Design a protein with these regions (language model features):
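Hydrolase catalytic cores
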Residues: 96-100, 118-124, 139, 150, ...
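Short, structured coil segments at secondary-structure junctions
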Residues: 3-6, 68-71, 113, 196-200, ...
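Active-site-proximal loop motif in hydrolases
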Residues: 41-64, 74-109, 118-132, 186, ...
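Protease zymogen maturation seam
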Residues: 2-53, 61, 66-69, 274-290
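Short, solvent-exposed loop/turn elements at domain surfaces
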Residues: 1, 63-70, 86, 127-128, ...
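Substrate-binding/specificity loop regions of serine endopeptidase catalytic domains
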Residues: 19-20, 80, 108-109, 128-134, ...
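Flexible, small-residue-rich helix->loop connector segments that border functional cores
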Residues: 57-67, 94-115, 139-147, 209, ...
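C-terminal subdomain of the subtilisin-like protease fold in secreted/lumenal serine endopeptidases
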Residues: 109-112, 119, 137, 144-155, ...
């Protein structure tokens, strides 16, 4: 195959995961009173995201969660192609709520409140999938997303050139991409897709309350562009519930929501960045409703 002029390269189809969250609180019942999570408040508050679209390449999304505006018609399941892109894990639903949970007096509210979230299911109920599934998902978004849309990618693995190239191809479409730096407390340059640099691509490290570096977060600038809240983040979860998770998986959606609204700026730098070059803390340049 490698000698075929029509074949760019041959690579093993490796396993990818979203990276284990540092903490998982017991899911809460559906429809508790709405709160504004500390992460949303720290990046400048929430704004109206109605009419804007975020593509969630993850474990799927709870398709009938009362706090999410899910567009399953554009969604796709690359794990089981005959099935709906529903979330049997919870991770993708959690990321979706950080981005776009509705301002509707229940549960939580996202950075771009009420934004449309599209489920691209590439990870299974255990939070893992193959690079071929993920690349297929990225290519699908590239073919269907519009300029100004945003994409969240809260997963990763070792260095893998084909996925890096797929992301560069997607970014060339004018789509803005938020990528989790990873939870291995190592140099993010050792991880794909976190290591990808380019126009419209933002790799995100994680912090805790008090602007303190999250000990699990990957580092190095480049490729990291911004730091965002990632520890003890409350958001939507599977089966219509809510939960608290920690990880760079939670940091990236904060930036995805900001990108969906428009421009991103910074408000100080994170404290304790191990690479000695503190990452700027992401903040929305859009006037907040709260």
């Amino acid at each position: 195959l490698q000698g075929n002029e029509n074949v760019v390269g041959v690579y093993p189809d490796m396993i990818v995961t979203y990276g284990l969250p540092v903490a998982l609180a017991k899911p809460t019942p559906s429809q508790p009173a709405e709160i504004t999570p500390w992460g949303v408040a720290r990046i400048g508050g929430f704004s109206d995201g109605t009419g804007k679209t975020a593509w969630i390449i993850d474990t799927g999304i709870d398709l009938d969660h009362p706090d999410l505006n899910v567009d399953q018609t554009r969604g796709k399941n690359f794990v089981l192609k005959s099935a709906l892109p529903d979330d049997d894990n919870g991770h993708g639903t959690h990321c979706s709520g950080i981005i776009g949970a509705m301002d509707n007096n229940i549960g939580t509210v996202g950075v771009a409140a009420g934004a449309t979230v599209v489920p691209i299911k590439v990870l299974n109920r255990k939070g893992s999938g193959t690079y071929s599934q993920i690349i297929a998902g990225i290519d699908y978004v590239a073919a269907n997303a519009k300029t100004g849309d945003a994409v969240n990618m809260s997963f990763g693995g070792g260095v893998y050139d084909p996925i890096d190239q797929a992301i560069l191809n997607l970014s060339a479409k004018g789509v803005k991409i938020a990528i989790a730096a990873g939870n291995e407390a190592q140099d993010a340059n050792n991880c794909s897709p976190a290591r990808v640099n380019g126009t419209n691509i933002y790799t995100v490290s994680a912090m805790a309350k008090g602007d303190l570096w999250a000990s699990y977060s990957n580092f190095s600038n480049p490729p990291v562009d911004y730091c965002a809240p990632g520890s003890s983040i409350y958001s939507t979860y599977k089966n219509g519930s809510y939960a608290t998770l920690s990880g760079t998986s939670m940091a990236a959606p904060h930036v995805c929501g900001i990108l969906l609204l428009g421009s991103i700026t910074s408000d100080g730098t994170v404290i304790g960045d191990p690479d000695g070059n503190p990452d700027p803390i992401a903040e929305s340049a859009t006037t907040a409703l709260y």
